[in-house]
Amino acid sequence: MPFHLRSLFLAILISFATALLGASAQERRVPSSSNEVRLSYAPIVQRVAPAVVNVYAARMIAVRNPFFDDPIFRRFFGMPGGSGEQVQRSLGSGVLIDPAGLVVTNNHVIEGADQVKVSLADKREFEAEMVLKDSRSDLAVLRLKTHRESFPALEFADSDALEVGDIVLAIGNPFAVGQTVTHGIVSAVARTQVGITDYQFFIQTDAAINPGNSGGALVDMTGGLVGINTAIFSRSGGSQGIGFAIPANMVRVVVASARSGGSVVKRPWLGARLQAVSPEIAESLGLKRPAGALIASVSTASPAARAGLKSGDLIINVDGQTIEDPNAFDYRFATKPIGGSARLGLMRAGKEIAVSVALEAVPDASHDELVIASPSPFQGAKISNLSPALADDLRIDPGAQGVVIVDVANGSPAQGLGFQRGDLVLSVNNAKVTKTRDLERIAAQQSRFWRITIVRGGQQMSMELRG
């Protein structure tokens, strides 16, 4: 190489190295002022925090004074034995999702409340009325009692767009200390084995969520609402870095029903009983791993039957979204709007096929429902005849016979004895129960002894009570 070319090449190398060293030194030096480096969530918080509110619920509960059972006490004070009432208060959070004053919160925050008040970030307080509550998703929608005021509100973001590792902020009122903001990342986007609501599909985050945060907002870095904070996993009662939020796409469904004036949430139903895929089933189907939702049975005259679904079909996706287990299917299907159709990807006899299923609302069974009012173990339970749609909704064998408990009044004898939504009553005092009127008639007999047989979670159990 000629001397002048070697000199030019060497000069270029020296200049390049100097530039690298200068850049490296510049990157590693300590910033000379706070203006050079500013990492803050303040702009997002300032925009979204005014839409996060505190929710105060008050309910009257019956209490019995143990001294009233003492005959000497009653004789001395001239008071009959009995019970009194006291006010029980609970505190949670909520999110304004409409400038007109609609607030979404957790159902467990306001369950059984006789009075609900909402406190805004600017310290204003309003009474709130119940618009809709949905125990299945643990969501409720309130409306502030105002005179045409306009409120700050959050917009929904697409919770399906979240990815593990995304940064999120949790905003609420933990331990009643006042509005608090914590940050973290998305730890999981489809946590299904949580056991909180009927729809087992949650966003998991390590953002600190504590008692009082229930019903608060989980927002992304654009300020969009991606979830409603609902629960924590904790052995101490405080945050341990495992919090769960209901995805915004499920919240949308509940809010849409509230805006349309409905008192219940309208969701599509399939009409098929699903089961998880075990390692043994996966091996028999030739799958590499357990995944999907296996159809165990199909109800007659259901959307599933009309679509041609069969027992043994394996649902692997809904509109292209992968299905890992029956809980994931329930969530994906429940967040579809009524009307139109959904395309299910199936494995049938070792081949992949696609089937279109109509998105139909669950048939109204309200005319079959009644509340047991007679003094009995069932007092306060709302019961219904078991229909294919209700069996699908509660994951009960559609071929079963009996009367199902669809709701239990807060503080009722039925709740005190542990009856739950989804319990299938088979017999009472050796009398078979097949219709709601059967159970109503038996409950009115006011027996001193009760022998009750129910099915819960697929397991038959019996209980004996004296009263």
Each model region followed by its residue ranges:
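Short glycine/Trp-rich loop-beta-loop segment that forms part of the substrate-binding cleft
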Residues: 102, 124, 157-178, 258
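Bacterial N-terminal signal peptides
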Residues: 9-19
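Active-site loop architecture of trypsin-fold serine endopeptidases
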Residues: 28-29, 34, 41, 63-65, ...
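Cleft-lining beta-strand/loop regions that shape enzyme active-site pockets
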Residues: 152-158, 166-169, 211-214, 382
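Short, conserved catalytic or interaction motifs in soluble domains
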Residues: 57, 99, 146, 173, ...
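Glycine-biased strand-turn-strand hairpin within the trypsin-fold
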Residues: 26-43, 47-103, 111-113, 124, ...
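C-terminal recognition in membrane/secretory proteostasis and scaffolding
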Residues: 2-7, 22-32, 39-44, 93, ...
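Conserved catalytic-core segment of clan PA serine endopeptidases
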Residues: 97-98, 117-147, 156-160, 173, ...
